Amino acid sequence: MKHNLLLAALLSSLSVGCYAADAVSGATPNHAAPGSQIKNVDAATSASIVPQKLRISAKATGFTDSKAKKVLFVVGDPRFDQSLEGFLVNTAANFFLKKGYEVEIRDLYKIRFNPVITPENFYHAKDGFGQTPDDIKPEQALVSKADYIIFCYPNWHDSPNAITKGYMERVFSKKFAYQDTPKGLEGLLKGKGIYTIMNAGWLGGGQGNVGDGIGKLDAVWDKYLGAYKVVDDDTAGFWGAKNLGRFVNDQSPSNLNPQYQQKLQKLASVLDARLERDFFRNK
């Protein structure tokens, strides 16, 4: 709850409404056309649909007992197999697979993950009391094995969407992700890295993190991403992990752009470069 309030306060200071005209430019056609004439177009949200012929996949290895580094993707997108967010996830998964890492992709909608903290499981999630719920045990086992946890979701309300946030709250429970000590709370996921991949449609200001603006309102872009960094640092630190940053795609190819394929390929190249920087060069 405190993370949501903090993020809301930080982002509200950016006067997002001032940029409303730009906010839809990435995913909304600039001219009207009958729906029957437009295929695979999502003109209402920033989670754009990728034309079927341009979609990619990743053959996740799952986790073994080998000493290979392990990356856990936690994906909260109901259209993962079609969306631009899904394209980013699969691009990132293939990036790590090529480096010999083991990859596990948890499609939260596909596995029908229940994000709701109920009165019955509240005290386990918040206080670590009682038995770990059966649906949480396999998720905690994956988190325990992972060297990196990457949260992936479309930007709908400037925070993790409900299913992703619920995963954080239920899986990263007390006595698993953190505990009380005489000196205060202690994170228990030391040595792990946390990262976020988020598709957006706000300013059209950049691809990446702070400093990755494209010359369009860079100061606002950096302030926007700086607000996320405050929350990401706090969340990772709460668990004892390290925040490795986030990749925000705020340059979604317009669905009707005649150069859509080239822009999509460029987006994949930019994501690869940002991952190389954030996971390997910045160590």
What would you call each of these model-derived segments?
Residues C18-A20, S25-G26:
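Boundary at the C-terminal end of the N-terminal hydrophobic targeting segment
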Residues E102-R112, F247:
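A short beta-strand-loop structural module common to alpha/beta enzyme folds
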Residues A8-S15:
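Bacterial N-terminal signal peptides
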Residues S57-Y101, A241, L267:
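N-terminal beta1-alpha1 ligand-phosphate binding loop
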Residues G130-Y224:
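Helix-loop-strand module that forms the ligand-binding subsite of alpha/beta enzymes
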Residues M1-N4:
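Positively charged n-region of N-terminal signal peptides that target proteins for export
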Residues L108-F129:
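N-terminal beta-loop-helix "entrance" segment that forms/cooperates
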Residues D42, S46-S57, T61-F63, L217-K283:
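Glycine-rich phosphate/pyrophosphate-binding loop and the adjoining helix
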